[in-house]
Amino acid sequence: MKLLTAPWIRRATAANVFAIAAAVFAADKIVEISINQPKDLFPESITSLKDGTIILGSVPGGIYKIKPGETEAKMFIAREGNGFTTVLGVLADEKAKTLWVCNTGPGELKAFDLTTGKAKGSYAMPTGAVCNDIAVADNGTAYASDTAGAKLFMLKKGATALVEAAADPLLAGVDGLAFGDKNTLYVNSVTANKLIKLDLGPDGKSTKVTDLKLSGPLGAPDGMRAIGKHKFLEAENGNAARAGGRLTLVTVDPKTNTATIQTLKDGMQATPATTATKGMAWVVEGKQDYRTGKNKGQDPTPFKLYAVKIP
């Protein structure tokens, strides 16, 4: 057998290092994830961490995590023992090391340790409320939408109970929410296909509610995630007004109260949620029609997530 020379070993080592680096690079460029287990995942909301981790909220209850470079959804916070009934919203607050969760039936805003998944608190909404999604202000105040009550509630840092932050007929069907700046909160209506601007006062409560003018129609808008000043991603489920799941980039001019809607990806099944990490916008198909709709009883898998580079 021929002995390996030092130069050959150096070349082989360099080749291996290159191969490993290429594999990591490839893993970081995953643009589609297909999840086959669990079959009752039915994701309704997604959030993410700066390192590329994606966290999914499952409607039947439970929180799942997909680590960077992986495609498998692993249980992070179990349904059992955590008071989950129906999970509609999840939001990672890395600054506060908190995962916020909207549970409904009853409506509650829940807080968990973002690293360990340990419960930190649970904050009840009024009877009949539907806690749907969450946004967090720069000062740490968490806002949660009540879709059934046409209201927003807030939980200030250190507070022990939710406080009503906004109530208005324009908020009927309120669902997703995202900050435009520290004094401006944008929300949508999943039932009325609207985008709405809320001006916030020093106490964090709404002082003015404005129906925005849209550059095009929306189709059951759902999850929203801020990605810049007066700029956010939005996921749409689709309806008679605009069919099919769609991911959009929305830019608002707060002076003219107009919203410019740019399609990033469409032609999907109903997409209830989006998130942004590492320059990519992720959107997920919820497949709720396989749970309670026309396809109930059929195999819903795979549950798919798609990534699009943010312009």
Please report, for each region that a protein language model flagged, where it lies by residue:
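Bacterial N-terminal signal peptides that target proteins for export
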Residues: K2-A14
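Short loop/turn segments that connect beta-strands within beta-propeller blades
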Residues: K67-T71, D113-K118, K156-T160, D199-G204, ...
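Blade-level signature of beta-propeller repeat domains, shared across WD40, Kelch, NHL, RCC1
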Residues: A273, G279-P311
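Structural motif
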Residues: E108, F153, K194-I196, R242-T248, ...
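A short beta-strand motif characteristic of beta-propeller blades
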Residues: I30-Q37, E72-G81, K118-A124, A161-D168, ...
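Beta-rich, blade/repeat-based domains predominating
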Residues: P38-I54, G81-L99, M125-Y143, A148, ...
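Beta-propeller domains
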Residues: L56-K74
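Short loop/turn segments immediately following the C-termini of beta-strands
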Residues: S58-V59, T104, T147-A148, V190, ...
